[in-house]
């Protein structure tokens, strides 16, 4: 994993666009490469969506023959408000590489974006990382679903509480690889930007 600290810092300072359903995203283009950023919780509505974790079945993509799965309702709602904006960009044939970055709430949305692009633009060189990202999948995933999330990394600092939510007891689990960094100083403190920066600096 390269440049994690710089990705984290840029994710927190970049200017975001906001949809009418409280989705927050930013797009950075450098030639044939796109970097997509997704913002942490930034208001009351984001927190409401965070706690709307009753699972809903995902809507199949066009030409999908298998691979429907159950998703956190709040995150699915936010992603669906962003999806049309992302679709307009990633279907440009000149785009050959996409990097996706999110923190906290934005890390959940980043996972859904990654899965969407993996299915709809399988020709693209794709990478993704979610710092302190919560779980998005409910139940068990089939082989084709797992394949669409393969390659995305959830970065967990210490024992960051948010990366353990929603709880396994409610049927949620991480479908993406979880990469651990840093030492724990407390469930809540481990989620703070300060602790992530410190842990990522130590990784470099």
Please give the residue ranges for each predicted region.
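Non-catalytic, mobile gating and regulatory segments of ester bond hydrolases
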Residues: 1-101, 105-204
